[in-house]
Amino acid sequence: MARRRAKALPKGKDEDVRTVAMLATAGIMSLVVAISVILAPIPQVGPDEGNQAPDFVSEAYSGFGWSEYRLSDNYDWDWNGSSDSNWFLIQFIDTDCPYCWIEGEEMSQLHSQWGDKVNFVTIAAQLNIPNHDSNRDEVEAFRDKTSYFGCNSDRDDCIDRPGTPHDWPYIDDGTNSILESWGLSGTPFTAILEPDGTVAWNKNKHQGEGGDGEDLPEALQRLVGGQ
């Protein structure tokens, strides 16, 4: 018996079929990507305002050696919103971060204005990127503005940091454990806490996408007032 030949598609029909198939595949892939974006977790930007700040214990440098520091030991747990207890300004930095280098001057200015009403605490992390290889000697020099070459991505002597020496605790977070517990992945970051440790202001919530643009000086004025 003679073998039947498959009927050939008219010229151009096979190209049309391939085009339709490619378009269908592209449409399915686009739909998958869109669903993935919708279902993907929202990037972490730090603790939500109104929640208790994540506590931590680490070594702190205050100008005279390193000693244990627990954030919650400094809270006023009886704060009722009307007492004169101090608020907290929590700053995360990396001594090799160029933005943190520049922010040193603003922090000096803010501390001179608010230091009697706000406890400043700087947490020195070490980001896992090139030329970010800090150590305690560098952290001390960054805080005190003393000579140590290696700050600002190994480009500058720490004595040249903008601003004045910082007269408040610097916390060692070389392992980034505190940074991660706060839901952060980069620096600089700042937050204002109420005297009982409740997060009152989160920089990323206000200055990130969809935020109202309120900056740190404005937030201090609104929340703490009196200046």
Write out the residue ranges for each language-model feature.
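N-terminal targeting signals for export/organelle localization
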Residues: 1-67
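Extracellular/periplasmic catalytic domains that process cell-envelope and extracellular macromolecules
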Residues: 49, 81-84, 114-115, 162-164, ...
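Thiol/disulfide oxidoreductase modules built on the thioredoxin-like
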Residues: 160-167, 171-224
